[in-house]
From Swiss-Prot:
Record's signal peptide: 1-24
Family from the record: Belongs to the G-protein coupled receptor 3 family. TAS1R subfamily.
Biological classification of the source: Eukaryota, Metazoa, Chordata, Craniata, Vertebrata
Name the UniProt record assigns to this protein: Taste receptor type 1 member 3
First-listed, main subcellular location of the protein, grouped into a coarse class: membrane
Organism: Felis catus (Cat)
Side of membrane Cytoplasmic, spans: 595-606, 664-685, 754-765, 816-865
Recorded coiled-coil stretches: none
Ranges for region Disordered: 840-865
Cellular component terms (Gene Ontology): plasma membrane
Gene designation: TAS1R3
Further remark: Unlike most mammals domestic cats do not prefer and are unable to detect the sweetness of sugars. This is due to pseudogenization of the TAS1R2 gene which prevents the formation of the heterodimeric sweet taste receptor TAS1R2/TAS1R3. This molecular change was very likely an important event in the evolution of the cat's carnivorous behavior.
C-alpha cells in the first residue's frame, strides 16, 4: 500500500532526526494527542503530576502546575491513538467513518481533570456548555470519554458524565463503588472491579495458610474502598486483621506519626504478611518510612495500583522490604506497540510533520485548559522504554474497541458501510454499551450489567534484580486461584515460606477456643467421645448422631453396632452349662421318680404331684433360653410368663405338701385325717390349677398394662447400641412375682417349726431349705439386678432362675434321689408314711406275711382311711 510505504519512509526519516536532536530536542508529540473525525473520543490521562496535592493548600482557584512527567500516562494515550488509527484504517467496525480523539492531561488531580471534562461537554463547535431543560438533542464535542485512570478521579468525572449520559470507559479505575448503576449509569471499565482483586488476595492468603495479617490502605477513595472490601471478605473467610491503618496523603501530612506507630506495631508483632491496598504515591510513602524504621522483612501483598509502579520499584532500599506479591490483569499481547511508539516519536521530531499538524489542527484551546502536555515534547524513547509492556496499556487500547463496537451496533454498520443517519448522540450510544461484546487483539471481552469486564488475573512475584525487580508469573486467578509453587521464591531469612498465624493449627480432633477478640487467636481443645471435629476451623465439636459413636479427638463418627446378650459370649456359655446341669438333674430326678412312682418315698413326696413339680421345674430351666440372642417383640412378651407359670406349678405342689405336714402336726388327729383326705384327693389339683390361674391373670395384666418392648439404647454403651427388653414398670414386674412369693412364704411358715418324730423322715426340713433357697436367690437378685449394667441384666436374670432351680433340686429332690439310689432300705412305709403306716400296719404286715415277698404299697392318698 503506497500510504503505508510513505508512512514508513517518513518514520525512518523522523527517527534519524530524533537521534540527531538528542535528548534535549523539542518535538511536537503533544500535538498528536488530538485528531478530528466524524465522531470524537475524549481522553483523560495522567501525563503528569503536581508537586502539591489537594485543594486545602490553595486560597484561590488557580491553575495547578503539573511538573512531574508520567511516561505511563503518555503510553496509555498513545495506545488509544493506535486503536483509533487501526479502526479508521480497517473496514470491520466503522467502514466509511473516521474516529477522532481529543486527549488531555489530568495531572492525577480531580480539579485538573474537570477542566477537560467541561471542554468535552461543550456544545460541538463551541467552548461552552449551554444550559437546557432537556439535553436529549444536545450534541457535545465528544461522543464518549476514555479514562481517567484512577478511582479518585473517576468518582468525580463519573457523576458529571452520568448527568449527560455520556459513556465513560476507564482503563484503570477499579473501586467497587463505580459498579453502582444508580449513581454511575454511564460508567464502564476494561479492568475488573476491586471486588475480584480482593477475592483473589483472600484466596491467596488462604492457600498459603496466612490468617494473621496487617491491612493498610491509602487515604483516598481507592485505598479506603479496597481496604473495606478486603476487611469484610477476609473476616468472612476466617482471616484476622491484627493491625489496620491508612497511609495519609499528601506525604507531608501531620498524620504520618500514626503511620509510624502502625509500622512499629507490625514490626513487634508476629504478623509476617501485610496487605497494602494503595496508590503508588501512598505505597512509596509507606515504604520510605518502613525502610527508615528498619522494618523486618515481610510479605507484601500488593494491589494492582502500585505493583508495577516505578515510583515504588526504584525506591532505594526496596530489596530489603521482603517479598512482594500481587495480581495483575491479563491482556492480549501488543507486539506492534513498541514499534508504533518509536514511529510516533520519530514523526514528532520531524519538522515537516509538525508543520502539517499545525496546519490541520489550528487552535488547541490552550487558553482554556492550558498546555496539553509540555513535557511530552521533550520525551525520548529511553524515557518510555520501561513502560512499553505495561499491563494497563491493553486496557486503554481495548476501551476504544468497546466504544467502537457499540457505535457499530448503534449505526447498524455492515461490510459495505454505515447507513447515513442523524449524528449519534451519547445517550443513544449508551443504550448499546450495556452488555456489548467486542474483541481486541483476538481477546473476547464483554461489559456486564455493572459495566465491568470478565478479565482474569496473573499472580506476579517481584524477583529482585538491578536496578528494578523482574515480575515473575507464579499463578493465575480465573475465578479460582492456581498457584505455581515451584516458581516462587521468598526474600525472607532462610528463604522459607513465612508463617503468619496467631495460633498454631489445631491437630485432628481438636477445635478452637477463641481467646480475645480475634478468631485466629485460640487454644486447641480436644473433642470428647461422642463428638468430632467436622472442619479444621470449627469452634465447637459436632455431636454424633444417636446411632453413631466416636472416640476422643475424632474427625468422624462411626456407626454403632447392635449389642445384646449373644449366644457366643462367655457368660452365656457358662449359663448354658449351668442350664444343662439343672435340666439334667431335673430330668434325672423326674425319671427316677417315675421309675419308683409306687415307692413310699415318692408317695410321701406327693406322688404324681411330685413328678408334675419336677416337670415344671424343668420348664423353669428351659425358660432361660428366651433371654440370649437379639430380643424381639415375641421373646420380650414371653420371658416372664413362661418363667413364672411353671414356677407357680412347682411351688403349688410344695404348698400342698407343706399344708399336709402342717395339718398332721398342728391339728387334732380327727381334723387332720379329714384335711389330709382333701389335700391328697382331686381337690389338690384344683389348688394347683387355681394357683396357676392366679399367676396367669397377673401375667396377663402385666402384658396388657405394661407390656415390655424392644428398645435400642444409644447412650448406655460407648460404641454400641444396646438392644434389650425394656420394663416400663418395676412395680408391675414385682407384682408378677407375688403369687410365687406367697406360695413360698406359706410353705416356709407351714414347715419351719414342725418337729419330726424320731426315726422318721423329716419332709418339712427339705421344704424349709427349698423355700430358703428360693428366697435367698430372689432377694439377692434385687440389688444385683438394680446395680449391674443394663447390658448384663438378662444374664443376671438367667443366673437367678437357674440358681433358684438348682437350689430347689439340691435341697428337696436330690436328697430323695440319694435315698432311692443309695439307701433303699429306708424306702419303707414306716420311715416315710408315719401315721399311714400305723393306721394300716396290719395290712402291710399281712401282705408281706402271706406272700413272703414285698407287696405293692397302696397309695396313701387313695387308700381308705
Amino acid at each position: 500500500m503506497p500510504g503505508l510505504a510513505l508512512l514508513g519512509l517518513t518514520a525512518l526519516l523522523g527517527l534519524t532526526a530524533l537521534l540527531d536532536h538528542g535528548e534535549g530536542a523539542t518535538s511536537c508529540l503533544s500535538q498528536q494527542l488530538r485528531m478530528q473525525g466524524d465522531y470524537v473520543l475524549g481522553g483523560l490521562f495522567p501525563l503528569g503530576s503536581a508537586e502539591g496535592t489537594g485543594l486545602g493548600d490553595g486560597l484561590q482557584p488557580n491553575a495547578t502546575v503539573c511538573t512531574r512527567f508520567s511516561s505511563l500516562g503518555l503510553l496509555w494515550a498513545l495506545a488509544v491513538k493506535m486503536a483509533v488509527e487501526e479502526i479508521n484504517n480497517g473496514s470491520a467496525l466503522l467502514p466509511g467513518l473516521h474516529l477522532g480523539y481529543d486527549l488531555f492531561d489530568t495531572c492525577s488531580e480531580p480539579m485538573v481533570a474537570m477542566k477537560p471534562s467541561l471542554v468535552f461537554m461543550a456544545k460541538a463547535g463551541s467552548c461552552s456548555i449551554a444550559a437546557y431543560c432537556n439535553y436529549t438533542q444536545y450534541q457535545p464535542r465528544v461522543l464518549a470519554v476514555i479514562g481517567p485512570h484512577s478511582s479518585e478521579l473517576a468518582l468525580v468525572t463519573g457523576k458529571f458524565f452520568s448527568f449527560f449520559l455520556v459513556p465513560q470507559v476507564s482503563y484503570g479505575a477499579s473501586t467497587d463503588r463505580l459498579s453502582n448503576r444508580e449513581i454511575f449509569p454511564s460508567f464502564f471499565r476494561t479492568v475488573p472491579s476491586d471486588q475480584v482483586q480482593v477475592a483473589a488476595m483472600v484466596e491467596l492468603l488462604e492457600e498459603l495458610g496466612w490468617n494473621w495479617v496487617a491491612a493498610v490502605g491509602s487515604d483516598d477513595e481507592y485505598g479506603r474502598q479496597g481496604l473495606s472490601l478486603f476487611s469484610g471478605l477476609a473476616s468472612a473467610r476466617g482471616i484476622c486483621i491484627a493491625h489496620e491503618g491508612l497511609v495519609p496523603l499528601p506525604p507531608g501530612s501531620l498524620r504520618l506519626g500514626a503511620l509510624q506507630g502502625l509500622l512499629r506495631q507490625v514490626n513487634q508483632s508476629s504478623v509476617q504478611v501485610v496487605v497494602l491496598f494503595s496508590s503508588a504515591h501512598a505505597a512509596r510513602t509507606l515504604f520510605s518510612y518502613s525502610i527508615r524504621c528498619k522494618l523486618s522483612p515481610k510479605v507484601w501483598v500488593a494491589s494492582e495500583a502500585w505493583l508495577t509502579s516505578d515510583l515504588v520499584m526504584t525506591l532505594p532500599g526496596m530489596p530489603g522490604v521482603g517479598t512482594v506479591l500481587g495480581f495483575l490483569q491479563q491482556g492480549a499481547p501488543m507486539p506492534e506497540f513498541p514499534s508504533y511508539v518509536r514511529t510516533r516519536l520519530a514523526l514528532a521530531a520531524d519538522p515537516a510533520f509538525c508543520a502539517s499538524l499545525d496546519a490541520e489542527q489550528p487552535g488547541l484551546e490552550e487558553h482554556v485548559v492550558g498546555p496539553r502536555c509540555p513535557q511530552c515534547d521533550h520525551v525520548t524513547l529511553e524515557n518510555l522504554s520501561a513502560g512499553l509492556l505495561h499491563h494497563q496499556t491493553f486496557a486503554a487500547y481495548a476501551a476504544v474497541y468497546g466504544v467502537a463496537q457499540a457505535l457499530h451496533n448503534t449505526l447498524r454498520c455492515n461490510a459495505s458501510g454505515c447507513p447515513r443517519r442523524e449524528p449519534v448522540r451519547p445517550w443513544q450510544l449508551l443504550e448499546n454499551m450495556y452488555n456489548v461484546s467486542f474483541r481486541a487483539r483476538g481477546l473476547a471481552l464483554q461489559f456486564d450489567a455493572s459495566g465491568n469486564v470478565n478479565v482474569d488475573y496473573d499472580l506476579k512475584l517481584w524477583v529482585w534484580q538491578d536496578p528494578t525487580p523482574e515480575l515473575r508469573t507464579v499463578g493465575t486467578f480465573k475465578g479460582r486461584l492456581e498457584l505455581w509453587r515451584s516458581q516462587m521464591c521468598w526474600h525472607t531469612p532462610g528463604k522459607q515460606q513465612p508463617v503468619s498465624q496467631c495460633s498454631r493449627q489445631c491437630k485432628e480432633g481438636q477445635v478452637r477456643r477463641v481467646k480475645g477478640f480475634h478468631s485466629c487467636c485460640y487454644n486447641c481443645v480436644d473433642c470428647k467421645a461422642g463428638s468430632y471435629q467436622r472442619n479444621p476451623d470449627d469452634l465447637l465439636c459436632t455431636q454424633c448422631d444417636q446411632d453413631q459413636w466416636s472416640p476422643d479427638r475424632s474427625t468422624r463418627c462411626f456407626a454403632r453396632k447392635p449389642m445384646f446378650l449373644a449366644w457366643g459370649e462367655p457368660a452365656v456359655l457358662l449359663l448354658l452349662a449351668l442350664l444343662a446341669l439343672a435340666l439334667g438333674l431335673a430330668l434325672a430326678a423326674l425319671g427316677l421318680f417315675l421309675w419308683h412312682s409306687d415307692s413310699p418315698l415318692v408317695q410321701a413326696s406327693g406322688g404324681p404331684r411330685a413328678c408334675f413339680g419336677l416337670a415344671c421345674l424343668g420348664l423353669v430351666c428351659l425358660s432361660v433360653l428366651l433371654f440370649p440372642g437379639q430380643p424381639g417383640p415375641a421373646s420380650c412378651l414371653a420371658q416372664q410368663p413362661l418363667f413364672h407359670l411353671p414356677l407357680t406349678g412347682c411351688l403349688s405342689t410344695f404348698f400342698l405338701q407343706a399344708a399336709e405336714i402342717f395339718v398332721g402336726s398342728e391339728l387334732p388327729p380327727s381334723w387332720a385325717e379329714k384335711m389330709r383326705g382333701r389335700l391328697r384327693g382331686p381337690w389338690a389339683w384344683l389348688v394347683v390349677l387355681l394357683a396357676m390361674l392366679a399367676e396367669a391373670a397377673l401375667c396377663a395384666w402385666y402384658l396388657v398394662a405394661f407390656p415390655p418392648e424392644v428398645v435400642t439404647d444409644w447412650r448406655v454403651l460407648p460404641t454400641e447400641a444396646l438392644v434389650h427388653c425394656h420394663v416400663h414398670s418395676w412395680i408391675s414386674f414385682g407384682l408378677v412375682h407375688a403369687t410365687n412369693a406367697m406360695l413360698a412364704f406359706l410353705c416356709f411358715l407351714g414347715t419351719f417349726l414342725v418337729q419330726s418324730r424320731p426315726g422318721r423322715y423329716n419332709g418339712a426340713r427339705g421344704l424349709t431349705f427349698a423355700m430358703l433357697a428360693y428366697f435367698i436367690t430372689w432377694i439377692s437378685f434385687v440389688p444385683l439386678f438394680a446395680n449391674v449394667h443394663v447390658a448384663y441384666q438378662p444374664a443376671v436374670q438367667m443366673g437367678t432362675i437357674l440358681l433358684c432351680a438348682l437350689g430347689i433340686l439340691a435341697t428337696f429332690h436330690l436328697p430323695k434321689c440319694y435315698l432311692l439310689l443309695q439307701r433303699p432300705e429306708l424306702n419303707t412305709p414306716e420311715f416315710f408314711l408315719e401315721d399311714n403306716a400305723r393306721a394300716q400296719g396290719s395290712s402291710w404286715g399281712q401282705g408281706r406275711g402271706e406272700s413272703g415277698q414285698k407287696q405293692v404299697t397302696p397309695d396313701p392318698v387313695t387308700s381308705p382311711q
